[in-house]
Amino acid sequence: MGNESNNGKVPLISKIAYGFGDVGCNFSWMFVSNFLMIFYTDVFGISMAAVSALMLFSRFWDAINDPIVGGLTDKTHTRWGRYRPWLLVAAPITAILLVLSFWAHPDWSNTAKIIYMVITYCLLVLGYTCVNIPYGTLCGAMTQDIDERAKINTSRSVSAMIAIGIINIVTVPLISKLGSSSAKNGYLFVAIIYGCIFAACHFFCFAQTKEQVVIPEKEKISIKVQLKAVMQNKPYLLALVGQVLFGFTLYGRNADILYYFTYVEGNASYYTTYSMCIIIPSIIGAACFQPVFRKLNNKGRTASIFALLTGIAMLAMYFFNVKESPVAFYALAGITQFFFSGFNTAIYAIIPDCVEYGEWKTGLRNDGFQYAFVSLGNKIGMAIGTALLAALLGKYGYIANQAQNPEVIAIMKHAFSTIPGILWIVTAIVLFFYRLNKKRYNEIVEDLKKGKSHSNNA
């Protein structure tokens, strides 16, 4: 197994720096998930059908490159470690691709628009993969202490919630301010700013973190063997299913949210007010993961409870709107975000622990490969959610920058509340069966330190 070069404790500056990594990730990917679809349809002038097809096609692309990148990170050997160098190299390239993706050319032909969209989006996804997979895997390489990992992921989630809050609050006004009367220019200038933040945050994460868990060279293994090992890792498979559902609910709703406020509520500026109301609950909810985990001693069950409560609150939002009941609407939005933030912290805290379980179960350790499939699962969920939304809006007559028909309005409303609410409850049911608790995990780590494993006894 990997040997830890210290007592498992991680310096505070490293936890903060790791959190800044997810700040950077959100200034790229949350900007993309919340704004790229409406940018394509309402600014670039691309059809809903083309956007829907892109979302599905890009997941086939992910199915190829995610496992490859994950495997390559595990095989990387430098004086800076396995995973940190990827942040240094891939982050600036991805920042450039982010800017290119938000560079609209509305006067081009439809064919030229679609070709440009496909090329820039697929390259952006690849660039983000080259940053996000090693970044996510890095947590497990920083320590094997389950409580320290919980603290690291809490730092990650709190930082992410702050970043998401800032993005949601300032993006719409920034687009308007920087673009003056041109949304095209506004999106481009915002992408330049966010791209610089993305790169800077990952440089800081690279500089202030350290890989403490040293993986022996002999543990290089083929993709076929790694896939077989993954299929024997039951906690990981449950987490993977949870990530697919998570991607569907989060990104499908995020893609809908600006449409919802623009066309259902009638004013895109409500999105800024909504974002201001959820930022504090987001931060508090993320910080509440640790006390709930200490009570339950099971990260999967902790995620399950947060998911269930998120779903219930989101279902309740269907019955309220900004115009008629603003207090109830915004209060429920804050409650929903509080529970979601707790879930977001828990679901990512699960993954590193599954690596040790897999090593104990099969004798193989493959941190990057496992995180690659988590990333792929999340993106598959995202693809289904966004592609389905785009397909339904296109089928029922969505017309950009015009008043929408009742069917389109109904789709936007349900995509904002009832559909993700139901899926959160399904997610809660799946993760309830996660049984790798703190006691069992610590026993597994001790076995591994002594050279024992389930595979040795088989």
Question: What feature does the model see in each segment?
Answer:
Residues 2-458:
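Membrane-embedded alpha-helical bundles of multi-pass transporters/translocases
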